[in-house]
Amino acid sequence: MPAPWTICSLLLLSVLCMDLAMAGSSFLSPEHQKLQRKEAKKPSGRLKPRTLEGQFDPEVGSQAEGAEDELEIRFNAPFNIGIKLAGAQSLQHGQTLGKFLQDILWEEAEETLANE
């Protein structure tokens, strides 16, 4: 019967070899990894704006005529944010949106200056 230290050393050696073999292998096939990369590059579904029936007064004009006065804002920070306002909406919500953006950008500028 082999000595206990021989059995322990063989067991330790086999565990180390198994760890080295597992560290170099991948659980996913190369084809699956390529498929995941392709799926990640696909653009995400875009949200469609709701139709605003009866929101515009006849004096202001139709939605097609107000399309020239659209305001569109996009952010590409950690995630995409898009805001699109028609002429009447920008008059109604523009000041609030401007204050919101100013607060966000001002906080980021202060953090950047504090980190430097």
Swiss-Prot record:
One of its GO terms (cellular component) is axon. The modification Leucine amide is found at L97. The lineage of its organism: Eukaryota, Metazoa, Chordata, Craniata, Vertebrata. This is Appetite-regulating hormone. Residues 51-74, 98-116 form a propeptide. Residues 31-42 have a biased composition (Basic and acidic residues). One of its GO terms (molecular function) is ghrelin receptor binding. A lipid is attached at S26 (O-decanoyl serine). A lipid is attached at S26 (O-hexanoyl serine). It comes from Bos taurus (Bovine). Belongs to the motilin family. Residues 30-62 are annotated as: Disordered. It holds the Pfam family Motilin_ghrelin. It is found in: Secreted. Keywords: Amidation, Hormone, Lipoprotein, Secreted, Signal. Residues 1-23 form the signal peptide. A lipid is attached at S26 (O-octanoyl serine). GO terms for biological process: actin polymerization or depolymerization; decidualization; dendrite development; gastric acid secretion; negative regulation of apoptotic process; negative regulation of endothelial cell proliferation; negative regulation of inflammatory response; negative regulation of insulin secretion. O-octanoylated by GOAT/MBOAT4. O-octanoylation is essential for ghrelin activity.
